[in-house]
UniProtKB/Swiss-Prot annotation:
GO cellular component assignments: ATP-binding cassette (ABC) transporter complex; BtuCD complex; cobalamin transport complex; extrinsic component of membrane; membrane
Self-association state and partner proteins as the record states: The complex is composed of two ATP-binding proteins (BtuD), two transmembrane proteins (BtuC) and a solute-binding protein (BtuF).
Gene Ontology MF terms: ABC-type vitamin B12 transporter activity; ATP binding; ATP hydrolysis activity; ATPase-coupled transmembrane transporter activity
A single GO BP: cobalamin transport
Entry EC no(s): 7.6.2.8
InterPro entries xrefs: AAA+_ATPase, ABC_transporter-like_ATP-bd, ABC_transporter-like_CS, ABC_transptr_BtuD, Metal_Ion_Import_ABC, P-loop_NTPase
Compartments, record wording: Cell inner membrane
Gene source species: Escherichia coli (strain K12)
Official protein name in the record: Vitamin B12 import ATP-binding protein BtuD
Gene label: btuD
PANTHER family: METAL TRANSPORT SYSTEM ATP-BINDING PROTEIN TM_0124-RELATED, VITAMIN B12 IMPORT ATP-BINDING PROTEIN BTUD
Residues in ABC transporter domain copies: 1-233
Catalytic activity reported: an R-cob(III)alamin(out) + ATP + H2O = an R-cob(III)alamin(in) + ADP + phosphate + H(+)
């Protein structure tokens, strides 16, 4: 798989790094680790929202060389939960994120996949937390999906499963898997280790802004690595063909 993004000695004051790594096309990479590990700081840096020490190459060019307009065409970024920036119908908010605004059928498909069909006419400031999270997810998917944006390469998601129930999480997993199969690189932070063990191709395990381990999910999410990151013991079980992590007292 081709390299979409290359990080070299990336650091930000005392919150992050230095750390190095690469993001590959057609893969789902999970950032895992305890609160304060640096996951959100790293995602914001990868999105081009902040600057600091070290270098990031995106699609073969320095990240800082990309204009905001061009960057928005090639990568999409979902920050942690935020309130609606203004009151507008959901359908209009989603349309604002589409590069091809004539693709109404795609908007309806993505909205339907995230169970937003009956929310399209509602104002964004009248949504519950979970509904607003799904609207935000639909927006970044519409922005970057190769179906309507051939230039789309990278999707960055900061705790996308927040406020989603089990069915909604499953629906999002299906969407992300389809985007991955179309060649998109996906990087997301997660607090659910078993979700990472099942759905990620690779993982970066962070603690205190440092990279403790990186590689294939089963190589990173080992009981010794997790004990070092979280300060507690873990066991890895095989249940009906599925690997599962549990903490032990």
């Amino acid at each position: 798989m081709s390299i979409v993004m290359q990080l070299q000695d990336v650091a930000e004051s005392t919150r992050l790094g230095p750390l190095s790594g690469e993001v590959r096309a057609g893969e789902i990479l999970h950032l895992v680790g305890p609160n304060g590990a640096g996951k959100s700081t790293l995602l914001a840096r990868m999105a081009g929202m902040t600057s600091g020490k070290g270098s990031i190459q995106f699609a073969g060019q320095p990240l800082e060389a990309w204009s905001a307009t061009k960057l928005a065409l090639h990568r999409a970024y979902l920050s942690q939960q935020q309130t609606p920036p203004f009151a507008t119908p959901v359908w209009h908010y989603l349309t604002l994120h589409q590069h091809d605004k004539t693709r109404t059928e795609l908007l309806n498909d993505v909205a339907g996949a995230l169970a937003l069909d009956d929310k399209l006419g509602r104002s964004t400031n009248q949504l519950s937390g979970g509904e607003w999270q799904r609207v935000r997810l639909a927006a970044v998917v519409l922005q970057i999906t190769p179906q309507a944006n051939p230039a789309g390469q990278l999707l960055l998601l900061d705790e996308p499963m927040n406020s989603l129930d089990v069915a909604q999480q499953s629906a999002l997993d299906k969407i992300l898997s389809a985007l991955c199969q179309q060649g998109l690189a996906i990087v997301m932070s997660s607090h659910d280790l078993n979700h990472t063990l099942r759905h990620a191709h690779r993982a970066w395990l962070l603690k205190g802004g440092k990279m403790l381990a990186s590689g294939r999910r089963e190589e990173v999410l080992t009981p010794p690595n997790l004990a070092q990151a979280y300060g507690m013991n873990f066991r890895r079980l095989d249940i009906e063909g599925h690997r599962m992590l549990i903490s032990t007292i």
